Amino acid sequence: MQQAPVVLSTLDKLLNWGRSNSLWPLTYGLACCAIEMMATGGSRFDFDRFGTIFRASPRQSDVMIIAGTLTKKHAEFMRRLYDQMPEPKWVISMGSCANTGGMFNTYATVQGADRVVPVDIYLPGCAPRPETLQYALMVLQDKIRRSKAIKQDAPKRLV
């Protein structure tokens, strides 16, 4: 007599698997890197195979991709968008300008997106190739799979 297969896993692994395979980035394209980000969404690189669908609303997104030069005028707006995203949320800083201000070392440029929002992954380059953004997404998926989905300070009992 053949028995039905049994799948054993933890709730953490199950939640993290679902989260890592359904990342919906909020696109925040500001300069040249935005063109490379748009190319990543095209058919040649096929972001959809990772379960990734670009969203224009922060309330439907869990990943923010900051692509390009961040000015001080945009910083407050970007922070507001970040605050509107539901938890858990992650940030990818794409390109030298988003990482460190790039060649724009002026009074009007934020010298790194991490001064405004917490950044999880930094992509170097000017502008990073679409393959680099795909690799960053795979690294983020791995990071999500290894994280704790259930907070330790959560109540032990629901009733």
Swiss-Prot record:
Its cofactor is [4Fe-4S] cluster. HAMAP family: NDH1_NuoB. The keyword NADP does not apply. GO terms for biological process: aerobic respiration; electron transport coupled proton transport. GO terms for cellular component: plasma membrane; respiratory chain complex I. Binds 1 [4Fe-4S] cluster. NCBIfam families: nuoB_fam, PRK06411.1. It is found in: Cell inner membrane. The keyword Plastid does not apply. This is NADH-quinone oxidoreductase subunit B. NDH-1 is composed of 14 different subunits. Subunits NuoB, C, D, E, F, and G constitute the peripheral sector of the complex. The gene is nuoB. [4Fe-4S] cluster binds at C32, C33, C97, C126. GO terms for molecular function: 4 iron, 4 sulfur cluster binding; iron ion binding; NADH dehydrogenase (ubiquinone) activity; NADH:ubiquinone reductase (non-electrogenic) activity; quinone binding. It catalyses: a quinone + NADH + 5 H(+)(in) = a quinol + NAD(+) + 4 H(+)(out). Signal peptide: none annotated. It is a peripheral membrane protein. NDH-1 shuttles electrons from NADH, via FMN and iron-sulfur (Fe-S) centers, to quinones in the respiratory chain. The immediate electron acceptor for the enzyme in this species is believed to be ubiquinone. Couples the redox reaction to proton translocation (for every two electrons transferred, four hydrogen ions are translocated across the cytoplasmic membrane), and thus conserves the redox energy in a proton gradient. Pfam families: Oxidored_q6. Keywords: 4Fe-4S, Cell inner membrane, Cell membrane, Iron, Iron-sulfur, Membrane, Metal-binding, NAD, Quinone, Translocase, Transport, Ubiquinone.
